[in-house]
Amino acid sequence: MNGRGYQSRSSWRDVESILGDDAISALERPIAEASSLPNACYTDPAWQALEYDRLFARTWFVAGFTQDIPDPGDAMPVEAAGMPLLILRDHDSEVRVFHNVCRHRGAVLVDKPCSNLKILTCPYHAWAYGLDGGLRTRPHFHGGNQHDVVRDDPDAPGLVPVRAEVWHHWIFINLDGKAPPLADYLSPALERIDDYDLSASQHAGTVHFDIATNWKFAMENYIEPYHVFAAHPRLHAFVPMAKREPSRIDRHVMWNQYIFDQAEEGRGAGLPHFPGLSHEATHRGSWFILPVPFGLEVYPDHVASFHVTPIAPDLCHERIDIYLIGEAADAPRYEPQRQAVLEMWRDLNKEDVGLIESLQKGRTSPAYDGGRLSPYWDEAPLHLSRMILEGMR
């Protein structure tokens, strides 16, 4: 689906006015001398508005999940880049995304998940739209009992579509409609996980967190393994620091992997593996992040996707979805293992929440404005900052 209707409202000069030359220069230095984005990038509402307008709008990012709209007529309202969108599955089971506003007065069309929809009706004046976004009727539009019925009029004010593509379980959107093809954008990441047949995975559960921190702290923490020994005792026991390496960079993708001795330790013993894995792949965990907040971890027996939605400069919503292989996703005999995996991810992320909330508080201090980085561990978090800046040029 192609999108239309989005126009940038800002310029590079707006970005420079918040950052300043010194902060831009500090980001571009070699890592031993560099510092990350300054405090305003984590605390200033004006900066977050620029991120929406210049970063989110111009690239691909995840706005929804196919398991949330499994059947024709299902619809899910979401907030993405600070605006209301509607994700639905039409009568032909095609996934579509629209701006979730009526073309009459701008009322939000759908405010909660719906099923079995035949038509979309505005709650304000009952303008009705098909699931293809086309305008169908406008009651009393020409006066009392003078209804407007629209038939095959390409100029009728239908819902504004958003460019969208589905990759396995994840619905990616590009608001300005100008990004390269999604396959090209994902290719550096897919090279890291090409031995896993993701089509064999099925949704098994979701874990949610509301976190009083900026979305970038969640992503920086996700790709930075330096904190594991101090923050995650169970994870450190699973793979100690001596076996960990810093995250690597491939264009706009930051990625990592490790090899572990026990393929099922701590992750629900007895779960089926992806088909056709090599011996090495049955003992490997791989993960990556994209600059606009989405991450994916792939293990022999499950997948975890990591999705962060910015809400305010100091608040984000984190959603972790777990996918298991084949019948392990819903068969009763795998219920204990499913719960073990979900609890593991819930507990692991609880260990991070207080830490990344403390980073947000720290960014209100004039004693800190970007920090000093570890040349060994912090290349990927610094690259994320640079990619955010580059995406806003």
Residue ranges with predicted function:
Residues 68-176, 183-184, 188:
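Rieske [2Fe-2S] iron-sulfur-binding domain
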Residues 57-68, 143-148, 287-292:
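Short Pro/Gly-enriched beta-strand edge/turn motifs at strand-loop
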Residues 2-112, 162-165:
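N-terminal pre-ligand scaffold of iron-sulfur
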Residues 33, 39, 43-44, 57-58, ...:
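Generic structural "secondary-structure junction" signal
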Residues 27, 33, 37, 131-134, ...:
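Glycine-rich, flexible loop/turn motifs
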Residues 64-71, 151-155, 283-287, 321:
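Short linear motifs in intrinsically disordered
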Residues 16-45, 114-126, 155-166, 236-271:
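N-terminal short leaders/motifs
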Residues 3-5, 94, 100, 162-166, ...:
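C-terminal catalytic domain of Rieske-type non-heme iron oxygenases
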